């Protein structure tokens, strides 16, 4: 079994599995639907179009739903094995890392995949338009996602929690729901993937544009000799980190300018092998702080980084002056 060369190669395999899942849903939906819309003369998506998009090399053969389910299970097993092997060989897979960072279940990760698909291949716009019987629909709805992912009505109803305000998908801003009007039911709302999550999954390493004015990602030194700390201070920090490494911890580093606070922050991050998302705290003044803090937290989780707020004292001074 080969490892993945990169995260994009893995996404291609994920899309093949998605095609099988959509094929299963398509076969179960029957051939009665077709996407058309008054005022869009000449635009029409047929069942044959969808079948060709899902299996362009498919020969004329009968595939049962049970065979499709087995195919999906086999694809999932191969994906897990190749991802595991890739990590062992030193190739991280961003789609898997997203699941780990935000504790996503496989159904939630599949919801991400369905929302991501139109960003990677325009054929999914046509497939979703057909399945929703609306030529203007380019993205999946909550209802369609749940139908594709669920085998029974009970599963479908239970899966609504994946799109509740407290769910990882919504609470961390991974997906966005788009109601046409305030009273549109959740099931009818279209789903898109947050733009920065799309960028991350497709290989971009930049910090999210919404926080780029006041946050930057910095790699931590890999060797203690790269730091300018006294041996006693380094030993104390090592002991402190060792006692708290398994728990989310806030370290407050204080002292006058030049006392080594920045070096201490680098040492803490280096001791756990993580980069730092460094925030210029005074520049947060005047922002919607709750929203910004949520975005910073998401970015730190996405990048597996320590969140470091610098120049906090300057913000206190601004408040005093105000």
Place the predicted regions along the sequence by residue.
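Intrinsically disordered, low-complexity N-terminal extensions of AAA+/P-loop NTPases
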Residues: 1-322
């Amino acid at each position: 079994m080969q490892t993945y060369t990169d995260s994009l190669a893995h996404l291609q395999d994920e899309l093949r599995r998605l095609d099988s899942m959509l094929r299963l849903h398509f076969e179960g939906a029957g051939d009665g639907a077709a996407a058309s819309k008054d005022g869009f003369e000449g635009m029409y998506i047929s069942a044959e179009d969808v079948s060709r998009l899902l299996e362009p090399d498919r020969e004329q053969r009968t595939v049962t739903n049970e065979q499709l389910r087995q195919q999906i299970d086999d694809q999932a097993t191969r994906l897990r094995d190749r991802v595991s092997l890739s990590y062992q060989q030193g190739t991280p897979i961003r789609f898997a890392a997203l699941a780990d960072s935000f504790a996503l279940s496989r159904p939630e990760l599949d919801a991400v995949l369905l929302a991501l698909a139109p960003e990677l291949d325009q054929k999914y716009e046509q497939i979703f338009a057909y399945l929703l019987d609306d030529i203007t629909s380019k993205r999946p709805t909550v209802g369609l996602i749940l139908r594709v992912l669920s085998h029974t009505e009970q599963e479908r109803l239970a899966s609504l929690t994946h799109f509740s305000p407290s769910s990882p998908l919504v609470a961390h801003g991974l997906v966005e729901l788009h109601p046409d009007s305030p009273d549109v039911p959740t099931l009818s709302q279209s789903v898109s993937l947050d733009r920065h999550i799309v960028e991350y999954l497709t290989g971009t390493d930049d910090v999210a544009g919404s926080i780029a004015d006041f946050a930057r990602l910095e790699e931590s030194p890999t060797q203690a000799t790269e730091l300018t700390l006294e041996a006693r201070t380094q030993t104390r920090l090592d002991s402190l980190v060792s006692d708290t490494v398994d728990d989310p911890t806030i370290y407050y580093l204080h002292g006058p300018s030049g006392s080594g606070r920045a070096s201490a922050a680098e040492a803490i991050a280096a001791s756990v092998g993580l980069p730092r998302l460094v925030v210029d705290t005074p520049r947060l003044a005047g922002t919607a702080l709750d929203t910004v803090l949520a975005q910073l937290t998401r970015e730190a989780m996405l990048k597996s980084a320590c969140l470091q707020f610098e120049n906090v004292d300057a913000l206190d001074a601004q408040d005093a002056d105000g």
